[in-house]
Regions:
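Helix-helix packing/entry segments at the starts of transmembrane helices
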Residues: 47, 101-104, 167-188, 220-256
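Transmembrane alpha-helices of multi-pass small-molecule transport proteins
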Residues: 14, 37-84, 112, 160-164, ...
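Specific alpha-helical transmembrane segments that line the substrate/conduction pathway
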Residues: 43-53, 82, 89-120, 157, ...
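Membrane-interface interhelical linkers
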Residues: 1-23, 53-77, 118-124, 142-146, ...
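C-terminal-most transmembrane helix of multi-pass membrane proteins
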Residues: 2-7, 49, 208, 244-295
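Hydrophobic/aromatic residues within transmembrane alpha-helices
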Residues: 35, 44, 48, 92, ...
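Glycine-/small-residue-enriched transmembrane alpha-helix faces in small-molecule transporters
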Residues: 1-43, 77-80, 84-88, 131, ...
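Hydrophobic transmembrane alpha-helices of multi-pass small-molecule transport proteins
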Residues: 77-80, 107, 121-140, 157, ...
Length: 295
């Protein structure tokens, strides 16, 4: 008689974990943005990745695994993509509201999903994504036009996110999350020279260290752990569908913590990109469901 409540709880639990993870990531982004006046986006990215790599090395101890040359190459590319994604996203946050930056960045994984499917319905999702981009990107009008450099940084972060997905799948095929830990180390080494050159001794400012540690936990250690638990309890495509609402979390985080007000047009643009991402994921699930049933 208790089967249905247990089934409902088993469904809601991983969803709750993902919602907490998304809230954690965007809260970390808001806190990171408050550090920019002190050490800049470059220094903030550097400290976040350094602390995150230390945390993940201590917890996962990836040096215990042996990797082939091919896997190690994939880990290095994966780590560079991760570093580029974090760096460019934080550079975008200097002039672009968090919600819009996340939506622009989300075009990376959306493109990977669409181009890997190539079903007729995907043209609808492409059109929705393009419509969202056209609403968000500067169009020469006054008032709420986005900074073009910031928008370019966010789109660049999306490209890095796409590479992160492609090479992350290859790097993680043999050693899973241990590869992710090594990737974070590579990302830290990749970005550190830029952050040190920009911020210098300001990186050691006493007030900055605890904030950077909090950002590393909120944006990396905690959400990674929660997402890993959730992935063991729900299908990967359901996971992808739920993650599609992350731009909305970014917009809400910017509103609550930084007072970033978005226009109705910008909210509609974010909604269009979210809808395109959800639609793509659901279309992929329908396309693969016969094969799953056959197994």
């Amino acid at each position: 008689m208790n089967t249905q409540p247990r089934s409902l709880a088993a469904t809601l639990f991983p969803i709750g974990l993902l919602l907490i993870a998304m809230a954690s990531i965007q809260s970390g982004a808001s806190l990171a943005k408050s550090m920019f006046p002190i050490i800049g986006a470059q220094g903030t990215t550097t400290l976040r990745l350094i602390f995150a790599s230390i945390i993940m090395l201590l917890i996962l101890r990836p040096w215990r695994v042996r990797m082939t040359t091919n896997t190690l190459r994939n880990v290095v590319i994966y780590g560079m993509a991760l570093g580029g994604m974090n760096f460019l996203f934080y550079m975008a946050l200097q002039t672009v509201p968090i919600g819009i930056a996340v939506a622009l960045e989300f075009t990376g994984p959306l493109a990977v999903a669409i181009f890997s499917s190539r079903r007729p319905i995907d043209f609808l999702w492409i059109a929705l994504a393009i419509a969202g981009l056209l609403l968000l990107l500067p169009a020469g009008h006054s008032g709420q036009a986005l900074d073009p450099v910031g928008a370019a940084y966010a789109l660049g972060a999306g490209v890095c996110w796409a590479l992160y997905i492609l090479f992350g799948q290859r790097a993680g095929a043999e050693h899973g999350i241990q590869s992710a830990a090594l990737g974070v180390v590579v990302a830290a080494l990749f970005v550190a020279p830029i952050g040190i050159a920009h911020a210098g001794s300001a990186l050691l400012t006493p007030a900055v260290i605890p904030m950077a540690l909090a950002v590393a936990i909120l944006s990396t250690a905690l959400p990674y752990s929660l997402e890993m638990v959730a992935l063991t309890r729900i299908p990967a495509r359901t996971f992808g569908t739920l993650m599609s609402i992350e731009p909305a979390f970014g917009a809400l985080s910017g509103l609550l913590f930084l007072g970033e007000m978005l226009t109705l047009t910008q909210w509609l643009a974010i909604l269009a990109i979210i809808t395109a991402s959800v639609g793509t994921t659901l279309s992929m699930r329908k396309a693969t469901s016969p094969a799953i049933a056959a197994d």
